[in-house]
Design a protein with these regions (language model features):
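Secretory targeting signals
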Residues: 34-37, 44-62, 107-170
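Cytosolic juxtamembrane amphipathic/interface segments immediately preceding
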Residues: 5-14, 47-51, 96-99, 238-241
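Terminal transmembrane helical anchor/hairpin motif
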Residues: 41-42, 48, 181, 185-250, ...
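Aromatic- and glycine-rich beta-strand/loop motifs that create alpha-glucan
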Residues: 1-25, 270
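Hydrophobic/aromatic residues in alpha-helical transmembrane segments
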Residues: 67-74, 122, 157-158, 187, ...
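A structural motif at transmembrane helix-loop-helix junctions in multipass membrane proteins
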Residues: 149-199
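Helix-loop-helix units of permease transmembrane domains in multi-pass membrane transporters
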Residues: 77-113
């Protein structure tokens, strides 16, 4: 454990020196506040408070932005170290590859968690002060922050995996961009095409909701929508969420970081420094 903490402290210092802490926090805060002010108009027609609408908007924001920030932080973690010669030096220390990976993961997840808490917390506080907030909307905000951190953890670990197999920083960057595109954009487009083709058949009613849990981005969205009636009303995503048991989306989102870390460890084990 002490070796993992030592690696984590070193990685966090590097992230702070490279301005990742400030950039990630600034980007998250800027977009969250912009969506909060932009979403103030429809609250009256929906019959929910401003914080609920803001949480619904920030849920959509997090689906796109959190994986992107996570992959930007992670794609260079192994490939970049190998190119700069730092990986060979690290391998001479009394630390295993698993401990090295966990140390990097803890540090970068801490950076991402800080950005999420500050960004969404500031936007949530602004919405609550401007338009009021109930107990359900406050719980939805807390859940959004927690699930965004889980989502970020999944994509950080996936970023380490592509960093290990990319061969170079350039190759890893291309794989990371493709990974983001597949999970965040193309997967849903493919499912949408299948639903349209099925025209309300068996696939739409039984298979489609479960396929959403296969994707961590969709599992994140389903968890936040299914757990709060107000957020479901603001997003309109009630059909797929109601077709699944309550544990399905949470279980998928919790398992994804563990699965992705396992894949990253296997890929990292094949790297020769």
């Amino acid at each position: 454990m002490s070796r993992i903490l030592a690696v984590s402290a070193s990685e966090f210092a590097i992230a702070r020196r490279n301005r990742w802490v400030f950039m990630a926090t600034g980007i998250m805060t800027l977009f969250a506040l912009a969506l909060t002010f932009a979403g103030a108009a429809p609250t009256g027609s929906l019959g929910v408070d401003l914080l609920t609408v803001s949480v619904a908007s920030m849920t959509t924001l997090s689906v796109y932005l959190t994986p992107l920030l996570a992959l930007l932080m992670a794609f260079d973690a192994i490939a970049g170290e190998a190119e700069r010669g730092g990986l060979a030096l690290l391998m001479t220390y009394p630390v295993s590859r698993g401990e090295l990976l966990l140390g990097k993961f803890a540090a970068q997840l801490g950076v991402l968690a800080f950005a999420v808490m500050v960004g969404f917390g500031a936007a949530g506080a602004t919405a609550a002060l401007a338009g009021g907030a109930g107990a359900e909307s406050l719980a939805a905000l807390a859940r959004l922050i927690g699930t965004s951190i889980l989502l970020g953890g999944a994509f950080l670990a996936l970023g380490y995996a592509v960093s290990a197999v990319g061969g170079s920083s350039t190759g890893a960057a291309g794989l990371a961009a493709g990974l983001w595109l597949v999970f965040v954009v193309l997967y849903d487009l493919g499912l949408l095409g299948a639903v349209v083709f099925d025209d309300g058949g068996t696939f739409t009613r039984t298979v489609f909701p479960w396929l959403l849990t296969v994707n961590p981005a969709d599992a994140f969205r389903l968890w936040n929508v299914a757990a709060a009636e107000g957020v479901a009303l603001a997003t309109g995503m009630t059909g797929a969420a109601s077709a699944l048991p309550a544990w399905a989306a949470p279980a998928a989102l919790i398992l994804w970081p563990l699965l992705a870390l396992g894949l990253a460890r296997i890929a990292f084990g094949r790297i020769e420094p």
